[in-house]
Amino acid sequence: FTLVDLNLPYFALPNTTDFASLVPGIGPNRTTRLHWFEYNVHAIPPHQQLQNFSAPLAEYQGPMPPQGDEAHNYVLYLFEQPEGWKPEVGAMQRYNNASDSFARMNFSVEALSTQVGRPIAANYFLTENENNTKTA
């Protein structure tokens, strides 16, 4: 499972002026942010209850669109992980620190797909900062 924000504005990344280097998000000068990454999850019979057999690669962090920004698209992707697949050590170290939000920015679902295959299911929701000032 991965949960990814597809609308992260460029100003959320420190010192970013090279927009061509960003993983494309939805809209100009937008990128992505990883909010959750679980792997080694299996459906356990008889009721196919999901059970995780490892710690999350990136612990869950809830949606947090910046105040004053448009609604953000959050997508939950489900991948069928290949037998014996484990994340790269560098990724494990990079995402392990839940308080380091910059390490989770510019996340590439496409790069993950090259390792484990295309998503087999997905769902999404929209949310925005409830403190936004509405106009018109």
Language model regions located:
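N-terminus-centered regions that define maturation/targeting leaders and the start
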Residues: 2-136
